[in-house]
């Protein structure tokens, strides 16, 4: 999604009204219920969220010049920096060490990288197809990517071949380096 | 409640991912200067424990010795590549030059055009804005004859611009970059000033 992304892709910037800001926050909480207790710490009431509309109908939400979450269609997707602050709240899967290199260069995640000894998938029933997951790596504390499941986690386990997770956002991609000024 | 994650000042990743960034050497230096605790945790006392460390790494990794070795090799190669690229870029930066040109418009009016800045990762638009407010004049970015971006400042501010760009480059650690000043109005200049010779600079040439 962010393979190519630069300032030229920005169409408009606008400040978000505080009422809409409130709905945004409640939407985030409804998507990730565990965020509820820390949401006011993550996004203080007084902070000013800015909406940046970009190419391909991507919308970024920033606070103080830092991208906190973004939206392509309906669902709000947190950015990695936002995830790092409170990683417990999101559905997480883990890849093995061998896969890190490829993930960091923006590849989709293949099933074997998730099912091998170093990888970790949740027990059944797991996560649905098309849901967003945080991708962690073996022996690492922080998430390195955010992806969208191309098949459900149970399917990944049984099929164990081909693309399992579509890459949305990873460490070092243009969104990660994105800087408003 | 919230976690504070340190990000590497060199590669911007969380430090545990520095090994994959291809800039490991500089990352290590940065981390050892900025966060000794984390450095010790990640890289240990490498000098006397390198062997133990390697064994440790293998033990804690699940992908097997052969693959780990391959990975290590790949990472080394990536690092070498990255270093080469950086060196090349630096050489390119050092060998390129900034051209500051003063051109005459009508009678006693001048513009100053600066080109060749894009190599140095300077945001032209922003710099133009700075100049505009610094000199209280009009300033914009436009394409020149060679289809390259240049900053055009209205008004005779050649010397000030030169000084400012010198300090700007110095800040970036690029002190030895050449600045070429083309001034079509000076008498002493050799007549090789191509482009502007046909402008109406008769005033000064008398």
UniProtKB/Swiss-Prot annotation, chain B:
Residues 196-206 have a biased composition (Low complexity). The keyword rRNA-binding does not apply. One of its GO terms (cellular component) is ribosome. It comes from the Eukaryota. One of its GO terms (molecular function) is mRNA binding. InterPro entries: DENR/SUI1_TIF (IPR050318), DENR_C (IPR046447), DENR_eukaryotes (IPR005873), DENR_N (IPR048517), SUI1 (IPR001950), SUI1_dom_sf (IPR036877). Keywords: Cytoplasm, Ribonucleoprotein, Ribosomal protein. Its main location: cytoplasm. One of its GO terms (biological process) is ribosome disassembly. Gene3D superfamilies: SUI1-like domain (3.30.780.10). Residues 184-206 are annotated as: Disordered. Residues 98-169 form the SUI1 domain. It holds the Pfam family DENR_N. It is found in: Cytoplasm. Interacts with the 40S ribosomal subunit. Belongs to the DENR family. The SUI1 domain may be involved in RNA binding. This is Translation machinery-associated protein 22. It comes from Vanderwaltozyma polyspora (strain ATCC 22028 / DSM 70294 / BCRC 21397 / CBS 2163 / NBRC 10782 / NRRL Y-8283 / UCD 57-17).
């Amino acid at each position: 999604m962010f393979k190519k992304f630069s300032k030229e892709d920005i169409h408009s910037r606008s400040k978000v009204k505080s009422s809409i800001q409130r709905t945004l926050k409640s939407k985030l909480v409804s998507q990730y219920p565990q965020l509820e207790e820390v949401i006011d710490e993550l996004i203080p009431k007084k902070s000013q969220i800015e909406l940046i509309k970009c190419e391909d109908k991507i919308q970024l939400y920033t606070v103080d010049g830092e991208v906190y979450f973004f939206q392509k269609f309906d669902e709000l997707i947190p950015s990695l920096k936002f995830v790092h602050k409170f990683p417990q709240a999101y559905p997480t899967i883990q890849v093995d060490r061998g896969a890190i290199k490829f993930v960091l260069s923006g590849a989709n995640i293949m099933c074997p990288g998730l099912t091998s000894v170093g990888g970790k998938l949740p027990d059944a029933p797991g996560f649905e197809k098309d849901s967003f997951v945080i991708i962690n790596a073996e022996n690492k504390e922080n998430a390195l990517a955010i992806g969208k499941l191309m098949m459900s986690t149970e399917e990944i386990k049984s099929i164990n071949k081909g693309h399992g997770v579509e890459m949305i956002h990873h460490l070092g991609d243009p969104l990660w380096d994105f800087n408003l000024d | 409640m919230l976690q504070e994650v340190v990000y590497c000042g060199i590669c911007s990743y969380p430090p545990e991912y520095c090994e994959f960034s291809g800039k490991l050497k500089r990352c290590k230096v940065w981390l050892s200067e900025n966060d000794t605790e984390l450095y010790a945790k990640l890289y240990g006392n490498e000098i006397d424990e390198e062997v133990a460390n390697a064994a440790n790494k293998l033990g804690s990794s699940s992908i097997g010795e052969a693959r780990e070795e391959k990975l290590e090799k790949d990472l080394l190669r990536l690092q070498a590549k990255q270093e080469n690229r950086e060196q090349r870029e630096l050489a390119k930066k050092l060998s390129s030059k900034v051209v500051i040109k003063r051109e005459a418009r009508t009678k006693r009016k001048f513009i100053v055009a600066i080109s060749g800045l894009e190599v140095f990762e300077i945001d032209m638009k922003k710099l133009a804005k700075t100049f505009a407010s610094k000199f209280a004049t009009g300033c914009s970015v436009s394409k020149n004859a060679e289809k390259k971006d240049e900053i055009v400042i209205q008004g005779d501010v050649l010397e000030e611009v030169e000084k400012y760009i010198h300090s700007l480059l110095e800040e970036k650690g690029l002190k030895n970059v050449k600045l070429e000043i083309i001034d079509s109005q000076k008498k002493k200049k050799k007549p090789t000033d191509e482009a502007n010779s046909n402008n109406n600079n008769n005033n000064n040439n008398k």
